[in-house]
Amino acid sequence: MFSLSSTVQPQVTIPLSHLINAFHSPKNISVSVNTPVSQKQHRDTVPEHEAPSSEPVLNLRDLGLSELKIGQIDKMVENLLPGFYKDKRVSSCWHTSHISAQSFFENKYGHLDMFSTLRSSSLYRQHPKTLRSICSDLQYFPVFIQSRGFKTLKSRTRRLQSTSERLVEAQNIAPSFVKGFLLRDRGTDLESLDKLMKTKNIPEAHQDAFKTGFAEGFLKAQALTQKTNDSLRRTRLILFVLLLFGIYGLLKNPFLSVRFRTTTGLDSAVDPVQMKNVTFEHVKGVEEAKQELQEVVEFLKNPQKFTVLGGKLPKGILLVGPPGTGKTLLARAVAGEADVPFYYASGSEFDEMFVGVGASRIRNLFREAKANAPCVIFIDELDSVGGKRIESPMHPYSRQTINQLLAEMDGFKPNEGVIIIGATNFPEALDNALIRPGRFDMQVTVPRPDVKGRTEILKWYLNKIKFDKSVDPEIIARGTVGFSGAELENLVNQAALKAAVDGKEMVTMKELEFSKDKILMGPERRSVEIDNKNKTITAYHESGHAIIAYYTKDAMPINKATIMPRGPTLGHVSLLPENDRWNETRAQLLAQMDVSMGGRVAEELIFGTDHITTGASSDFDNATKIAKRMVTKFGMSEKLGVMTYSDTGKLSPETQSAIEQEIRILLRESYERAKHILKTHAKEHKNLAEALLTYETLDAKEIQIVLEGKKLEVR
């Protein structure tokens, strides 16, 4: 084996097995070196035709190399075999040792004279003239120097510049026989390899061996090159995949991913929102608020109509109202009617954990809006970003966002053509500088719908489902006092789901009443097993509430009473006013307290003070809240007068004691009134409790029948 190491070409290993087999083994060679000259001369007389029978015979045509020209053999031999010099004084890499000798062979047997080795071989004895002529024509070629060491990029670079011998090596190694044979000009008339070997008087057996060694070396070089390229390609692919996984892991980390993100997160606000399918026809039950916003839309469509009189486009509109009344729906209707760019943002989208992000997003939002003026910006949950500025060590930089919002709405730079619509259900938390004229010029209240508005909303949502003609939306509207638009939509949807579960083809009043009770009293829990004793206590408890509500003048009418467990309670009495109540009188508040006391009073009268239960805790909470508001907010206490007390913690001990005394008096009087009514109507109380134990649920008409002493129809 010869090791071909080059700094220019990849390492090529050329096995010349057939040529080396012609020489003796290492031991025989070492002996032949010390043989006298006379013995060598005697061996030279061996006939040439007595070649060893072990020499292999190979056809060059089988390797595909028979078409080589004659002129290629000289350069091929120059690139393949090293030159031999008898004079050891010639400077050569064969006489240079960096770590040890040039090969393991010389480490073991010492330096040999190559001509002596050749002359002692059987091949030389058989063909002395042929080998002598070949070796005389061979040129010095240092490519077969065995270079041993750590194969690193640093060591290879150092070898290129370490010694002049390496530079000579790099100069003599032309792109070797691989590049020479593949890129040679094919138009040149070169002699074939076969003719050249015949000219040099090389026997056919040795020609085949020589060509076989050449072919094997060429194929080995190609295989090693391909293997190296494949390894590099796989390594690069693995590193690239690991890099992608690393970047993905950083992006998934909530703390590190922010550093790789720009000021996105407000993409929905920066891009205009199209709301072509929502108009003011979809808004029901809030006619006054809708009228206010329709004027703004008209201003956007035809500004000359208003500016001819010197009017200006309003800069901000603040929508205020309880949850579910349609504030966001109104803003969407403005977007659909105005036909101008509409930008949406939520108050919680501005601020994050890093300082300055909120102010930057405010600037980006208004910069985009000004570039597309006239336009509308809708900020939902405005109290999240526009709350009052306070000095707090927990949020020392929270004022930057609202300050930037104030400057953009009405600051030094003009802001023409951009209308800001804000929505909140907590206007008390807004900063005073934000709600002043010039920023939010208009404040529109979006209240809960009245009976007429609830009827319109129910008709709108009923038209989206299949319902029976016997359904009367006005009856449902009168029984849903205080419901918002969102709650009415949920009521209709729950009724449709109930009808689908029961296998009905359309929604009837039964499903609507069921969904109303489910919203008012909670879902039924029929799987709960209650013993007769607790069921009896619950029946008398709920009957006590119903008796007080029925016989108290200013109490709200009864809607339904049940001892079916619903939600967290074992029973419930639903009260609904006949009409919308815009305010409440002192008599109505006292009646509510009396109704709340009815449950505990009934337990005490029927079962005794030792058997009262904890079921009245929520009733006492409700009664105490009413009494406290009457004393501290409504000015309904004769002793304390019309003064209000918003923060009782800052009051003097005497005042606090007086407030507590007045609340205690109101509760005691309410308890006594409820006890008087139940003692007076003890028979009706008993009949109603027995009816509840029998039927579990009674509506207003059935309760009236029982209290009048009549019998209910068998269900």
Swiss-Prot record:
Residues 41-52 have a biased composition (Basic and acidic residues). Its EC number is 3.4.24.-, 3.6.-.-. Residues 34-54 are annotated as: Disordered. Detected in heart and skeletal muscle (at protein level). One of its GO terms (biological process) is mitochondrion organization. ATP binds at V283, T325, G326, K327, T328, L329. Binds 1 zinc ion per subunit. It is found in: Mitochondrion inner membrane; Mitochondrion. Pfam families: AAA (PF00004), AAA_lid_3 (PF17862), Peptidase_M41 (PF01434). ATP-dependent metalloprotease that catalyzes the degradation of folded and unfolded proteins with a suitable degron sequence in the mitochondrial intermembrane region. Plays an important role in regulating mitochondrial morphology and function by cleaving OPA1 at position S2, giving rise to a form of OPA1 that promotes maintenance of normal mitochondrial structure and mitochondrial protein metabolism. This is ATP-dependent zinc metalloprotease YME1L1. It comes from Mus musculus (Mouse).
